[in-house]
Design a protein with these regions (language model features):
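Catalytic-core "active-site belt" of small-molecule-metabolizing enzymes
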Residues: 1-145, 149, 157-168
Length: 168
């Protein structure tokens, strides 16, 4: 749904991008997060996050925020360039508390509200590619290591954040 929302063609196979470890933030609940001052328009994208164990197996899951510098990403897309600069800034990979995954992930829901207003909501079962399909595809493309994180994509409803917004 997010790809359609962004005007992209539906994918027949997953696409991936990288975020540097320095982009990772694992803040305690209720804390304030600082966005880089030089960014004009940062969008929220709520996602399921997988943490990998030995042999690239799924060991834990969490809710995450993939923060995107939308203007820079749009420029990169138009020029056919990588998205690293738009996705890899400080605090652009915010991850909540990890838990042991339940049996089956399809019934889990992702929800995000900004200042109490619902913005994103969908079940994992509505994803174009299942989390395990993403993991399988990525493991064929790149070497995966214990501790690696895989953000699994976002539902429709992404949008900009303003300084002082409260995200739940």
């Amino acid at each position: 749904a997010h790809a359609k929302e962004m005007g992209a063609k539906p994918l027949t196979s997953p696409r991936f991008f990288l975020k540097p470890w320095a982009a990772l933030a694992e803040p305690p609940m209720g804390c304030e997060m600082m966005l880089p001052r030089h960014l004009d328009e940062v969008h929220h994208e709520v996602e399921l996050v997988l943490r990998l164990g030995e042999d690239a197996t799924l060991t834990e899951i969490a809710v995450g925020l993939d923060m995107t510098d939308r203007a820079t990403q749009d420029e990169a897309k138009a020029e056919g360039m990588p998205w690293t600069q738009s996705k890899g800034f400080a605090n652009s990979a915010i991850v909540g508390n990890f838990i042991e995954p339940p049996v089956g992930l399809a019934h889990l829901r992702l929800e995000l509200a900004v200042n109490g207003e619902p913005r994103q909501e969908a079940s994992i079962g509505q994803m174009l590619f299942t989390p395990l399909d993403l993991l399988s595809s990525l493991s064929q493309w790149a070497p995966l290591e214990k501790g690696d994180l895989l953000f699994c994509g976002t539902p429709s409803g992404i949008g900009p954040l303003a300084r002082g917004d409260h995200v739940q």
